[in-house]
Structures are given as structure tokens and as C-alpha cells.
Regions:
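Exposed, low-structure sequence patches enriched in small/polar residues
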Residues: 106, 196-477
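Outer-membrane beta-barrel channel domains
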Residues: 1-264, 309-314, 465-469
Length: 477
């Protein structure tokens, strides 16, 4: 084949200012915010009908991110989805500067104020993005203004109440707003109740735009109990947050028992536990069920052995294309699977894990193998290998998926380091490479040399290649 390419040389300059307004309050200002040195996202295989949640990796948004945290409970925000449940997050900073197609959008700049004022924890953020155009000149993403306001008040030692407001606005007819209230009631050292409620406003949606959750947690050294109820309206649309599934009501529960064996030479403790999630639509029809029974055994020297059994129920209302040419028809599906897992102590110079899952899957069967291995030959060099292989056999068609990554980190000196990540995703037919060289020439001042490449394994070949150089200099005043 003949590869036609176009070279683009782009330069820009930006800056950040950090000002300690008070001992507990910090103001950050940024102009032409740049994230070229940020590590690439970890590739994932998606065998569900729902969008995947990717964590924030950009330092500017990770710094003081806790001041924008909303909700408190864990079953309805962040984390992994169980049995078709919904992940809900009031504010997710990845919505700023990254569009729905995972494309970088230029950021003109903005400001952030975070910290403590008495019993108040506050976080405010204002950012302005530019527009993004395609190669043909059409607008892919419009310029947007983003505003986030978060305040939380401590009530005693264990309780708090707070409010969250977000606003994304491109024009008078293109906007999204969200208002939320949350609270935590710490009844005692063992018992907490978390609750939140949110409402969104979008010009093209009207009514049924609320979401809320209440969660109960009780824990002791040997027992942990959790119960949660989640309600998400059909038109709930947090464009500056994240929601996996709307129009549902879900009950989520779990029970953990953790017996310890101080006299055993081999077993430190066990952690048998059960989880159950029950999801219905707004009319009361059952959408999904998920039951998880697990037996974890933690060994004296840091290793872990686990055996689990999962049962799933899914109501599929629309055809679901799970792979190219493989479409699962609407209907009710039930299946079970068994999972075996071994993890070695991560503190060793050589560590790893092995995970094997086999059983039913929608209308057929699935087997999955996941292997991870790490090697640290010295204090300055480390390698991490991850492999994931799925074999899926359905009446509608059979297919396989593969996901692989190799990470290598090398610290030449305390001032110079290199971080490399190579990934392969068969679902996207992509091979990706991200190599970052960093040199700290004075404390707080850095030089970065970054190489990124994306290739289609079968087909057109090279998709994108970029070599980036970035210099930062810290001025103290």
C-alpha cells in the first residue's frame, strides 16, 4: 500500500499560576492549558451495551480533585458496573477538554479555587475550551464555557452536607446544567448513611431529569454490610458528569465476613462475601439481576486465592451488536459463570496474577483468561505485562477478543526518567504506543519529549504519529 501523510508542526505557549490566598485556600490560574505529557488511557474491551468509565489522568484536574467529590457512597458512582447497573458521577473532569469521541479539545484556560474555610470545604472551577474542527473544516466540537461549584459543610466529626452546581454552555440554545445536594450522617464509628439527589437541565429534554441514591454502610473488623437504593430518571443528563444507564431503579446489597487466623502458618484471613443487584425500569419491569458469591483467601505471605460464582439475568429490549456481524436479538437471557483467581504479593520483585472465567454468556458460552506479570530487576527499572483473551461462542456467531499491554518504566537518575506503554486492542484493531521522556532541570521545572503512535493492525496501517516537546519553568514569587 501507499501511505500518504501530512506533516504538521504546531507550537504554543501557556502558563500556570498558583497563589496561596490563605494557608488553607489555593487559587490556580491556567492559560493555554497543555496535557501533551499525560499518559495514554489504558485500553479496554467492551462487551456490554453501555459506555465505559475512564478515570482522569491529567495532573491539573487530579490536583485537589477531592474538593469536587460528590455523593460519598460508592455503589452508585465510580467503580464497576454490576448486572447492568448504572454508574453515576455528578462531576467528571474528563468532560472538560475531551469530547465524546475521546478527542482532545483545546483549552484556552481558566481558574480554580479550592480549600477550607472554617468548617466549609469549597471548590470552584471555570474553564473555557476552543472549538475543534475536522480535516474537512466542519465543526466537531463547539467552544464551551465550563463552570463547577462545590461546597461542603462539616457537621460534627462524622457528618457533612453539601451542594454541587455545574454548567456547560456553548450558546443560548446549547447548554447543560446540574444541581445536586448530598450528605453523610455518621451515626457512630461503624454506621454511616450517605444520600444524594441531582437534577439536570437540557434544552432538548423536559421532565424526569432527577437522580438520587441512599446508601447504608455498617462495618466491624469481621463483618461489613452495605445496602443502597438508586433511582435515575429517563431524562437525567449530566453532561459534565457521567451516567451509564438512565430510566432505572436499582437495589444493591453486599455482605462480607472476614475471619482472621493469627495462629495459622499459611492463612492470614478469609473474606467470603455475597453481592446482589436488582434493576427495574420506571414501570417496574425487571431489567437485570446479578448475584455474586465469592470466597477470598489471603495467605500469610501476601498472596490471594479466590473462587467465585456469578449469576446474571438480562432483559434485552433492542438488538445488541456485541461484535462485527454478531447481533444478539431482543429477549430474556440468563446465565452463570465460575471465576478462579490467584494473585501474588505485589511487593515482590516478580509478581503476577492469573484469572480464569468460564460459563454462560448471553445466548451461548464464554471463556476468559487474564494474566498480569510484573518484574522489578532493580530500584530504577520495572516492567508490567497484561494479557486478556476472550473466546465467545454464541448461536449468532463466534468471535475472540485480545487485549495486551506492556509497560516499562526507567529512572536514569533522580532527574531523568522514561515511561513507555505499548497496547494492542483487537476490538478496535489498534496498536498504540506512548513513550514519555522527562528531565527535571531545576526543581519544579521540566522538559518533556513525548512520542505517540496509533496503527491499524489490519488495513490502512498508520493512523496517527506525533512527536511532542514541552518545556516548563517554575517562577517563585
Amino acid at each position: 500500500y501507499v501511505y500518504e501523510y501530512e506533516d504538521d508542526y504546531i507550537g504554543d505557549i501557556g502558563g500556570d499560576v498558583k497563589w496561596s490566598v490563605s494557608p488553607n485556600l489555593t487559587l490556580d490560574l491556567t492559560v493555554n492549558t497543555d496535557f501533551s505529557q499525560v499518559e495514554a488511557d489504558n485500553q479496554r474491551i467492551n462487551l456490554t451495551r453501555f459506555s465505559l468509565f475512564f478515570p482522569e489522568k491529567r495532573d491539573f484536574f487530579l490536583e485537589n480533585a477531592g474538593f469536587f467529590s460528590f455523593g460519598g457512597g460508592s455503589s452508585g458512582r465510580g467503580g464497576s458496573r454490576m448486572g447492568g447497573g448504572s454508574t453515576v458521577q455528578g462531576f467528571h473532569s474528563r468532560t472538560i477538554g475531551i469530547n465524546a469521541n475521546n478527542q482532545q479539545v483545546p483549552l484556552y484556560g481558566g481558574g480554580r479555587l479550592t480549600g477550607k474555610v472554617g468548617k466549609w470545604s469549597i471548590g470552584t472551577l471555570i474553564m473555557q475550551s476552543g472549538s475543534l474542527e475536522s480535516a474537512a473544516g466542519s465543526e466537531v466540537s463547539p467552544s464551551n464555557n465550563y463552570i463547577v461549584g462545590r461546597a461542603s459543610y462539616d457537621v460534627g466529626e462524622r457528618s457533612r452536607a453539601g451542594v454541587l452546581f455545574t454548567n456547560r454552555q456553548a450558546s443560548s440554545t446549547d447548554y447543560n446544567r446540574e444541581l445536586g445536594f448530598d450528605g453523610r450522617w455518621g451515626i457512630n464509628d461503624q454506621t454511616t448513611v450517605d444520600a444524594w439527589i441531582m437534577k439536570t437541565e437540557s434544552p432538548h429534554l423536559d421532565g424526569d431529569d432527577f437522580a438520587g441514591q441512599i446508601q447504608f454502610d455498617w462495618g466491624s473488623p469481621r463483618f461489613q454490610v452495605r445496602g443502597a437504593y438508586l433511582d435515575v430518571g429517563d431524562n437525567f443528563n449530566p453532561e459534565m458528569g457521567f451516567v451509564t444507564r438512565t430510566g432505572i431503579r436499582a437495589i444493591d446489597s453486599s455482605f462480607y465476613w472476614t475471619p482472621f487466623f493469627p495462629d495459622s502458618r499459611y492463612v492470614r484471613n478469609l473474606s467470603p462475601h455475597v453481592m446482589y443487584r436488582h434493576t427495574i425500569d420506571r414501570g417496574g419491569e425487571l431489567l437485570s439481576k446479578y448475584a455474586h458469591l465469592d470466597w477470598d483467601m489471603f495467605l500469610r505471605y501476601g498472596d490471594k486465592v479466590s473462587v467465585a460464582h456469578n449469576r446474571s439475568y438480562e432483559l434485552l429490549e433492542l438488538p445488541f451488536q456485541i461484535s462485527a456481524g454478531v447481533i444478539i436479538p431482543p429477549g430474556v437471557y440468563e446465565w452463570g459463570e465460575v471465576n478462579l483467581e490467584f494473585q501474588s504479593d505485589a511487593g515482590r520483585s516478580v509478581d503476577g496474577s492469573f484469572n480464569y472465567t468460564t460459563g454462560g454468556f448471553w445466548s451461548g458460552d464464554r471463556s476468559e483468561i487474564r494474566v498480569q506479570a510484573g518484574w522489578r530487576p532493580g530500584s530504577r527499572l520495572s516492567f508490567a505485562l497484561s494479557l486478556n483473551h476472550n473466546e465467545i461462542d454464541l448461536p449468532e456467531g463466534a468471535f475472540e477478543t485480545d487485549l495486551a499491554s506492556l509497560r516499562a518504566d526507567l529512572d536514569f537518575t533522580t532527574e531523568m526518567s522514561m515511561r513507555s506503554l505499548i497496547q494492542y486492542n483487537s476490538q478496535q484493531d489498534m496498536m498504540l504506543a506512548n513513550v514519555r521522556l522527562r528531565y527535571i532541570y531545576t526543581p519544579g521545572s521540566d522538559l518533556y519529549l513525548v512520542y505517540n503512535e496509533t496503527q491499524v493492525v489490519e488495513g490502512s496501517g498508520l493512523v496517527d504519529r506525533a512527536v511532542l516537546f514541552k518545556a516548563t519553568y517554575l517562577l517563585r514569587f
